[in-house]
Regions:
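Glycine/serine-rich anion-binding loops at beta->alpha junctions
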Residues: 106-120, 202
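Acidic/histidine-rich catalytic neighborhood of metal-dependent amide-processing enzymes
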Residues: 115-187
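Short glycine/proline-enriched loop/turn "hinge" motifs that connect secondary-structure elements
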Residues: 90-92, 134, 183-188, 247-250
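Acidic-enriched catalytic cores of C-N bond-cleaving enzymes acting on peptides and small amides
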Residues: 184, 204-250
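Predominant activation on well-ordered alpha-helical scaffold segments within soluble catalytic domains
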Residues: 21, 44, 120-127, 158-161, ...
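Acidic/His- and Gly-rich active-site-bordering loop/insert found
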Residues: 2-110, 130-135
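Phosphate-handling active-site elements
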Residues: 75, 103, 125-140, 224-233
Length: 250
């Protein structure tokens, strides 16, 4: 079977690159749910063509969807699952139209590795196994469109839990380290929200009566930043700040 799989991959190299290019060129972040729905439909069709009983799970138009399914549901073995996401951190046209390109043997473009490349690998893993006559166990897939925002919509988390339930192993198709080492675990993130309140006063004739919330927030931001410890792998990132009313009011 190994030889059959290797031959299939070699014979389909250009098809793999073409699908990779098309997916990367369908740009969009989770901030553009319309783009996520378009990509989800494209992915669902591709996996259906590969034999996967696949569908797009939608909750609302403004919420990025989930693509999930299974091939070989009646096979005797315990299922495995491939997971991932099809959103990126980049807004459309950040790198101009059709940003996918290959230079000196390397591919470039938004999401080319994180993680549209991993989704294309999943697609062709399934195709290669099918071509080789694999019948050992069911293979499930589950991909969301809002991972880069932390899967803020509980719907995606529910779908991942549903499809992963009962699986013997899961393969998250995110890119590994740049040195090609195998990545067996990932550091997750936690989002926090901090409100800082001041005392409103006129900044000209009543300055001492006020307390500037922005100044206090600046101290808090520096304190958070000082919690960084690269040796321990601790990353603190004050990312978004909103505050103030008008220039002459504390």
């Amino acid at each position: 079977m190994k030889k059959q799989i290797q031959e299939f991959i070699a014979q389909n190299r250009q098809n793999i690159i073409d699908d990779w290019r098309d997916l990367v060129n369908m740009e969009g972040s989770c901030r553009q749910p319309d783009a996520m729905h378009t990509i989800a439909d494209w992915l669902c069709e591709k996996f259906q063509q590969a034999g996967v009983d696949c569908q797009v799970y939608r909750v609302r138009d403004e919420v990025p969807p989930v693509v999930a399914g299974v091939i070989g549901a009646d096979r005797p073995g315990t299922p495995v699952i491939f997971t991932g996401h099809f959103d990126t951190v980049f807004d459309p046209n950040t790198f101009g139209p059709n940003p996918f390109r290959i230079e000196d043997g390397k591919a470039y473009g938004p999401g080319v590795l994180d993680m549209k490349g991993g989704i294309i690998i999943t697609l062709y893993v399934i195709k290669a196994l099918e071509a080789a006559g694999y019948k050992a166990r069911p293979i499930r897939i589950c991909f969301c469109g809002d991972e880069e925002a932390g899967k803020f919509h509980a719907y995606a988390c529910e779908q991942f839990q549903k499809w992963a339930d009962g699986c013997i192993a899961g393969f998250n198709m995110e890119t590994g380290p740049v040195n090609n080492d195998l990545c067996t675990g990932r550091k997750w993130a936690m989002w926090g929200h901090l409100d800082v309140h001041g005392v409103s006063a006129h900044s000209g004739n009543n300055y001492t009566a006020g307390r500037n919330a922005l100044v206090e927030a600046a101290y808090k931001i520096l304190a958070i930043q000082n919690c960084n410890d690269m040796e321990k792998g601790t990353n603190m990132n004050p990312a978004v700040i909103k505050g103030g009313t008008v220039p002459n009011i504390l």
